[in-house]
From Swiss-Prot:
Gene: tuf2
Protein name as annotated: Elongation factor Tu 2
Localization per record: Cytoplasm
Organism: Yersinia enterocolitica serotype O:8 / biotype 1B (strain NCTC 13174 / 8081)
Annotated region described as G1, given as residue ranges: 19-26
Similarity remark: Belongs to the TRAFAC class translation factor GTPase superfamily. Classic translation factor GTPase family. EF-Tu/EF-1A subfamily.
Length: 394
């Protein structure tokens, strides 16, 4: 059997399984790869291949994550599954595996449990845009009314966290029976795949979003002007277009008079490329690392935001002691550290290493940000936590 060529023609969508421990997330992941491979071609992955997840580093944090891939006739999916609850928390907060949609696995035998709730809340905070529910272990429940009750509970829970609970697709299945090849349960996996295809819209590609380039370096070229360098995060910048310099200082407008890559002149710079952008009428000292170059009006500078944060444990190289209100670490956004103060939720006196917590941060300088922006928390250059902007306040 020859290796299939990787087809770039299909839309690529990132998904993952979330939900309470032992509700069958990994079994479902194995079942999806197995049933879809059998039906549409591709390679199946066994439970134990997925379960011993390799370690990865994201923003200085070690996370165990398994990545599998599968295809439906219309799409290619990259699917992430994590072995432990802490790995999910870290994964979602660091954005190590950004999800275009998530499959929430709920055992019909248990109904929603504490981690079910926590994963839904995290999904809301970190901006997982779509959820599909897979009610697992339905082969173990004979009572149709009980199944309806569990479905109702899950829908209410999703609605409580601002997901459209009444409209979300719910598939009642059995991952284990599907893995064992029982036709009626295999059909439920095909039904789930159908919802992945139809309910999760095709994600907007980075190159189609408004232009943004985090500035890494600035230098002046005599007779030509000031050049900023960095990797284009999203969108396209064309020679002759207006851009804004946002963050740290007052926002300033300029015009891109040249784009270069590897000393060659280009007419545009695109998402993913490392480029130098020549700016008209800007002095070397007017601009610094940590600012961004962006399409005018597309992003604003902010200082205060609500965030969802994971604090590294001592074993992960984090702090050895808790911190209290009045804690003033550095917050690392894209290319620079900014000092900030924190406000803990009511009734929370201290935060222990290994905790995840919601907190309001106020920075000493404004930074260009939108909801969903990831950051690291650092003390003297050492990462002690990771976070995501849940909601910009001011």
């Amino acid at each position: 059997m020859s290796k299939e060529k990787f087809e770039r023609t299909k839309p690529h969508v990132n998904v993952g399984t979330i939900g309470h421990v032992d509700h069958g997330k990994t079994t479902l992941t194995a079942a999806i790869t197995t049933v879809l491979a059998k039906t549409y071609g591709g390679s199946a992955r066994a439970f134990d291949q997925i379960d011993n997840a390799p370690e990865e580093k994201a923003r200085g944090i070690t996370i165990n994550t398994s990545h599998v891939e599968y295809d439906t006739p219309s799409r290619h999916y990259a699917h992430v599954d994590c072995p432990g609850h802490a790995d999910y928390v870290k994964n979602m907060i660091t954005g190590a595996a950004q999800m275009d949609g998530a499959i929430l696995v709920v055992a019909a035998t248990d109904g929603p449990m504490p981690q079910t709730r926590e994963h839904i809340l995290l999904g809301r905070q970190v901006g997982v845009p779509y959820m599909i529910v897979f009610m697992n272990k339905c082969d173990m429940v004979d009572d149709e009314e009980l199944l309806e009750l569990v479905e109702m509970e899950v829908r209410e829970l999703l609605s409580a966290y601002d997901f459209p609970g009444d409209d979300i697709p719910v598939v009642k299945g059995s991952a284990l029976k599907a893995l064992e090849g029982v036709k009626e349960w295999e059909d439920k996996i095909i039904e789930l795949a159908g919802y992945l295809d139809t309910y999760i819209p095709e994600p907007e590609r980075a190159v189609d979003k408004p232009f943004l380039l985090p500035i890494e370096d600035v230098f002046s070229i005599s007779g030509r002007g000031t050049v900023v360098t960095g990797r284009v995060e999203r969108g396209i910048v064309k020679v002759g277009e207006e851009v804004e310099i946002v963050g740290i200082k007052d926002t300033v407008k300029s015009t891109c008079t040249g784009v270069e890559m590897f000393r060659k002149l280009l007419d545009e710079g695109r998402a993913g490329e490392n480029v130098g952008v020549l700016l008209r009428g800007i002095k070397r000292e007017d601009i610094e690392r940590g600012q961004v170059l962006a399409k005018p009006g597309s992003i604003k500078p902010h200082t205060t935001f609500e965030s969802e944060v994971y604090i590294l444990s001592k074993d992960e190289g984090g702090r050895h002691t808790p911190f209290f209100k009045g804690y003033r670490p550095q917050f690392y956004f894209r290319t620079t550290d900014v000092t900030g103060t924190i406000e803990l939720p009511e009734g929370v006196e201290m935060v222990m290493p290994g905790d995840n917590i919601n907190m309001v941060v106020t920075l000493i300088h404004p930074i260009a940000m939108d909801d969903g922006l990831r950051f690291a928390i650092r003390e003297g250059g050492r990462t002690v936590g990771a976070g995501v902007v849940a909601k910009v306040i001011a």
